[in-house]
UniProtKB/Swiss-Prot annotation:
This is D-alanine--D-alanine ligase. The lineage of its organism: Bacteria, Pseudomonadati, Pseudomonadota, Betaproteobacteria, Burkholderiales. It catalyses: 2 D-alanine + ATP = D-alanyl-D-alanine + ADP + phosphate + H(+). Its EC number is 6.3.2.4. GO terms for molecular function: ATP binding; D-alanine-D-alanine ligase activity; metal ion binding. Belongs to the D-alanine--D-alanine ligase family. The gene is ddl.
Amino acid sequence: MSSNADTSQAVSAGTSVGATFGKVAVLMGGMSAEREISLMSGRGVLQALRSRGVDAHAFDPAERDISELKKDEFARCFIALHGRFGEDGTVQGALELLGIPYTGSGVMASSMAIDKVMTKRVMLAEGLPTPTYVLLRRGSYGSADVSAVPDKLGLPLIVKPAREGSSIGLTKVTERAGMADAVAQAEKLDADILCEQFISGDEVTCPVLGTGSEARALPVIRIVAPDGNYDYQNKYFTDTTQYLVPCGLPEGEEAVIQQLVLQAYRTLNCRGWARADVMIDKVTRKPYLLEINTSPGMTGHSLVPMSARAAGISYEDLCIEVLKTTALDHQSQGGGAS
């Protein structure tokens, strides 16, 4: 009897908390190359929020005009969009104009973080370690420039579009003859192609929850992919990649990674939540920041829920915690929503 009563009280409490958020739009799908991943993330978030009594509704900006959010009287948005028009500051700017608070980073932080080259420039300016790179911009480079990249970065090296996620368009180039094809593949997706020094060693990722001084790093996950190839397919559609949490790094290294990630998160002025990817040189054990994802995946294979679970945070609680951070840029700067 008491067990049923406890369950009833827990459900009632969850429903009560959910009601405080008002009508919530879970933005999913969108128009980027990561649309399918976004739909998977969004469906998971939608189900989790509803299970906690939140009046949550799916909203696909590729199928509906964003202005309908205001007309339909949504109180806030959980952004489960990935890639362009979703985590690049575009939808964030639209929500700012509509006066609807949203999850994740604001306009400027989102637009900087999705641009891997801009992120690198900011990191280097702040003295944060990131792999050496060469930028190739469509229309301003020739075959000689492409051939010269291995001379500057060594082999192997990484070639990827500057503004895509989920490893879409990424190629690990192991010999000079593969450069032209790798650049052509990346250029199909972006006018800016990032060629990056390859760091051989442990690949790790670390989520962050919170804003400013209240931001905290979650447990680090070490990623062990088949043949070291953590590509789009291995990220989302296979079970052969290992995700180790606890990460099993040498003593003290996890804390160093967490501190570095928090520093990068605050440097870009991220808020709410994000996830940073890091490589650790196998010889020197020096960590190198690769990128920060300001709208991380929330699929069954995604890393933020996995790390949160290791910290004792369920998927449902994680969604609620992220939803609690909804804000507008001008609110966080001391203003109020119109």
